[in-house]
Amino acid sequence: MSEQKDMYVLGIETSCDETAAAIVKNGKEIISNVVASQIESHKRFGGVVPEIASRHHVEQITLVIEEAFRKAGMTYSDIDAIAVTEGPGLVGALLIGVNAAKALSFAYNIPLVGVHHIAGHIYANRLVEDIVFPALALVVSGGHTELVYMKEHGSFEVIGETLDDAAGEAYDKVARTMGLPYPGGPQIDKLAEKGNDNIPLPRAWLEEGSYNFSFSGLKSAVINTLHNASQKGQEIAPEDLSASFQNSVIDVLVTKTARAAKEYDVKQVLLAGGVAANRGLRAALEKEFAQHEGITLVIPPLALCTDNAAMIAAAGTIAFEKGIRGAYDMNGQPGLELTSYQSLTR
């Protein structure tokens, strides 16, 4: 019996403000992973400017793909599939990656696979260790906060999601109100390490048994706290405000994740998304799940938490194995829903 041939997938990611390309072997092993960040270009605006993001993607896309091949020491003849982020994201940014992937697929006759950005974040964990099912993913990013139950590869059931602001969005808005530089999340995380949780802030548990999240009330409470202090001529230590805000967010995230993991009897909990780089959240989850027998916690390294193309290649490998193929009329879909792979085969 002959050995199964290794599968090499080229991943392309341009959903927001990182232009990325990567080559991944068998959905698990990173051969190359190249990311061109735009943070410096967006800093002075206090957030991502879609038009600027698109222009940077146009400038960088060919370069990062070429660099991914150079670092891997490979050519297009070695590639079995091209996986690209189809959505969600900024439509102009998505189109750069999708059009590049379609052009390469056509030029080199390589199968094309569209990938959901959040599926990519979840599958970043497979680049660390095998996913054991049933699994629960806590997805925390600038645009998403979700609890996703997975009974098998490519199966996604959203059991909880934010009703308003995503956790990362709340971090950025609070940081902006505090006068912290962009991106605000890492700044709050650093300050929180030095501060005390001594400012009373709300925690939105919502209705009993709910796995949904809400951070708009917390965000407003922080803004009101700062405004009231300013009106009274008082100063609030940014370290203490950061610690109080961050603990309010983490408390809800960790408590609901632990409760869902128990109720759904999962074997593994996966942390995913840009906010997964938050040291306070990582430490709180590690402390919580050290007490849960039979559940392993997987946290990707920092470089795989933020947007990258290795995670897109990893998710694309699973989609490809399930028979999913993208057509040349593929488009960027800014509002793409996270749907199980088996219902997408086309």
Curated annotation (Swiss-Prot):
Main location per the UniProt record: cytoplasm
Keyword annotations from UniProtKB, A to Z: Acyltransferase, Cytoplasm, Iron, Metal-binding, Transferase, tRNA processing
GO CC field: cytoplasm
Catalytic activity: L-threonylcarbamoyladenylate + adenosine(37) in tRNA = N(6)-L-threonylcarbamoyladenosine(37) in tRNA + AMP + H(+)
Keyword tRNA processing: yes
GO molecular function terms noted in the UniProt entry: iron ion binding; N(6)-L-threonylcarbamoyladenine synthase activity
GO biological process, one term: tRNA threonylcarbamoyladenosine modification
Residues binding substrate: V139, V140, S141, G142, G143, D172, G185, D189, N278
Disulphide bridges, residue numbers: none
Cofactor(s) of this protein: Fe(2+)
EC number: 2.3.1.234
Cofactor binding, note field: Binds 1 Fe(2+) ion per subunit.
The UniProt record lists the keyword Cell membrane: no
Family from the record: Belongs to the KAE1 / TsaD family.
PANTHER family: TRNA N6-ADENOSINE THREONYLCARBAMOYLTRANSFERASE, TRNA N6-ADENOSINE THREONYLCARBAMOYLTRANSFERASE, MITOCHONDRIAL
NCBIfam families per the UniProt record, alphabetical: gcp_kae1 (TIGR00329), T6A_TsaD_YgjD (TIGR03723)
Other noteworthy facts: The four proteins YwlC, TsaD, TsaB and TsaE are necessary and sufficient for tRNA(NNU) t(6)A37 threonylcarbamoyladenosine biosynthesis in vitro in B.subtilis.
Function recorded in the entry: Required for the formation of a threonylcarbamoyl group on adenosine at position 37 (t(6)A37) in tRNAs that read codons beginning with adenine. Is involved in the transfer of the threonylcarbamoyl moiety of threonylcarbamoyl-AMP (TC-AMP) to the N6 group of A37, together with TsaE and TsaB; this reaction does not require ATP in vitro. TsaD likely plays a direct catalytic role in this reaction.
Assembly and oligomerization: May form a heterodimer with TsaB.
Record protein name field: tRNA N6-adenosine threonylcarbamoyltransferase
Organism: Bacillus subtilis (strain 168)
